[in-house]
Amino acid sequence: IKPPLALDRLPPLDEAHKAGQNAKSIFKLRFSAMATELLSLGIDFNCAPVLDIARATTHRFLRNRCYGMNKSDVIALGRVAYDALKSNGIFPIIKHMPGHGFASHDSHFELPVVKASKKELLANDFAVFRAFCDAEIAMSAHVLFEAIDPYSAASTSKKLMDIIRNDIKFSGLLISDDISMAALP
């Protein structure tokens, strides 16, 4: 099996901006090839695109899967990835709704706490997901947004679910990230 399913790794996606105007065509090729490989194995969905905005403080485990450091780049490249998967017969699952980019900790091992204001989140991270409110399936994030719900991770928070449904306007199927991750009690 060739990458991305093998142990060999493709170059980190957080370097996509270095491709300049070629980034979109590279993403189309990359995600079209990924779709072809998945279909050849009988797999018809992929937990991609990753729509988190990378920041200098984003945990490296997530950062190398992000498509950019601003919402415009993430939306543009995320849409190319989404469309390439879908047009090649794969159901894309957007993630990590409503945004994981502010997290400086890996949710596989602990619950990341985001201290950004609700206003900043709505204008940036949540705005990326609003641009994809037409998606059929999304995966939630195990991240605690202190300004919105200081007690529950987004994946278990009624307040965050209300934001996802009412502010982001996502009406599709919402699935949880892995519930065995240490971020959840």
Model segments located where?
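Enzymes and membrane/adaptor proteins characterized by extended Gly/Ser/Thr/Asp/Glu-rich
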Residues: I1-D73, F102-V114, A141-A153, S176-P185
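Second-shell residues forming the walls of enzyme active-site clefts
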Residues: A76-K86, I90-P185
